[in-house]
C-alpha cells in the first residue's frame, strides 16, 4: 500500500508539528493559554471580506457567528463523561458470561433468549472477545449459536466474526449485520405470523453496511441501502428498498423479489442475482445486466437450498 504513495510518514508528523506551533503562536497573541479556553470564543472570530468574489460576497455568516447569552454556571465544553450504559447491554449482562466457555475453550454454546428494541449491538461485544483471542480466523463454524425471539434493536450482530451464528425470529431495526466479519445471521418472521414474508418489511435500513465476510439469510423484505460497501458477504433476501448494493465491491446478493431505485450505484465488484428485476431501477453506470446462465442458476440453487 505504501508503494502507491509518495512521501514519508515523517512528513505528516512534521506537518502536524508546524500546525501546532502556529496555533500556539496565534493563541499567544490572543492571550489564550490552552485550546480548551478557545471553545465557545465566538468573539475572536470574524468573517473575512470577500468583496472581490461574487459568490463568496453573498455568503452571510452572521447567524453562525451569533453569540447567545449563556449563564456562567453553564459549561460551554465537555464537562461530564457520557455514560453508554454498557453494563446494561445484553452482551455485558448475559451473553459474555454465557459464551465464556466458547471464548476460552472453544466449547459449543447453544442458547435461546428474548430480545427487544432497546437491546442494541447484540453480539458485538462477544464478537470482539472472540476476535481479540483468535484474530481473523475466529472460531470453528457454529461454535456460538444464539437464537433470539422478538424485535432486535439497532446494529444486531454488528461485526460478529467467524464461529458466531445469530438467529432471530422476529424483526430488526437499522444497521443489522453492520461490518459483518465472518459470522452468520438469519432472520425470519415469527412462526405464528400470518403475513406474507415476501411482502413485508422485516429489517430496517443500512443492513450489512461495510460487511466483509460471512453469510446472511433474510426471510422477508429489507429497507434502503442494503449491503452498501459489501466486500465479501453472501446474502439472500426477499426484496429490498432503494440504493441496494451501492458501492459494493465483492460478495454475492440474491434478491428473491423486487429491488428499489438506484440499485448497484457505484457497484464495482461482486454479483447480484435478482428474480424480479425492473431495469429502470438499476444504475448501469458500472454494472452489466444479463440473464442468468447455467453456472448462475446452479449457484442460485445452492444459495436457496
Named regions from a protein language model:
Residues 41-57:
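Short glycine/threonine-rich loop-to-helix capping motif typified by GTGT followed
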Residues 34, 55, 60-61:
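Short, solvent-exposed coil/turn linker segments
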Residues 1-33, 39-40, 63-305:
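Long, distal/terminal scaffolding or interaction modules
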Amino acid at each position: 500500500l505504501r508503494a502507491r504513495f509518495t512521501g514519508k510518514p515523517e512528513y505528516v508528523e512534521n506537518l502536524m508539528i508546524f500546525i501546532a506551533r502556529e496555533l500556539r503562536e496565534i493563541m499567544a497573541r490572543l492571550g489564550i493559554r490552552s485550546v480548551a479556553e478557545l471553545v465557545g470564543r465566538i468573539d475572536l472570530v470574524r468573517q473575512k471580506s470577500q468583496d472581490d468574489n461574487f459568490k463568496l460576497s453573498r455568503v452571510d455568516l452572521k447567524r453562525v457567528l451569533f453569540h447567545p447569552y449563556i449563564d456562567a454556571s453553564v459549561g460551554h465544553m465537555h464537562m461530564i463523561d457520557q455514560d453508554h450504559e454498557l453494563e446494561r447491554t445484553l452482551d455485558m449482562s448475559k451473553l459474555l458470561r454465557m459464551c465464556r466457555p466458547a471464548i476460552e475453550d472453544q466449547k459449543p454454546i447453544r442458547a435461546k433468549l428474548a430480545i427487544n428494541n432497546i437491546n442494541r449491538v447484540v453480539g458485538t461485544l462477544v464478537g470482539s472477545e472472540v476476535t481479540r483471542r483468535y484474530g481473523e480466523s475466529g472460531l470453528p463454524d457454529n461454535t456460538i449459536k444464539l437464537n433470539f425471539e422478538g424485535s432486535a434493536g439497532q446494529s444486531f450482530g454488528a461485526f460478529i466474526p467467524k464461529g458466531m451464528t445469530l438467529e432471530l425470529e422476529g424483526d430488526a431495526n437499522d444497521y443489522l449485520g453492520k461490518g459483518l466479519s465472518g459470522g452468520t445471521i438469519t432472520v425470519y418472521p415469527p412462526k405464528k405470523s400470518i403475513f406474507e414474508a415476501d411482502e413485508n418489511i422485516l429489517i430496517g435500513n443500512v443492513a450489512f453496511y461495510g460487511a466483509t465476510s460471512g453469510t446472511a439469510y433474510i426471510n422477508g423484505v429489507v429497507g434502503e441501502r442494503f449491503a452498501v460497501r459489501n466486500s465479501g458477504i453472501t446474502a439472500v433476501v426477499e426484496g429490498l428498498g432503494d440504493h441496494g448494493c451501492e458501492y459494493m465491491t465483492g460478495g454475492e446478493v440474491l434478491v428473491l423479489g423486487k429491488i428499489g431505485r438506484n440499485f448497484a450505484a457505484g457497484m464495482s465488484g461482486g454479483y447480484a442475482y435478482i428474480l424480479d428485476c425492473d431495469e429502470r431501477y438499476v444504475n448501469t453506470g458500472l454494472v452489466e445486466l444479463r440473464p442468468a446462465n447455467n453456472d448462475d442458476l446452479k449457484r442460485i440453487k445452492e444459495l436457496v437450498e
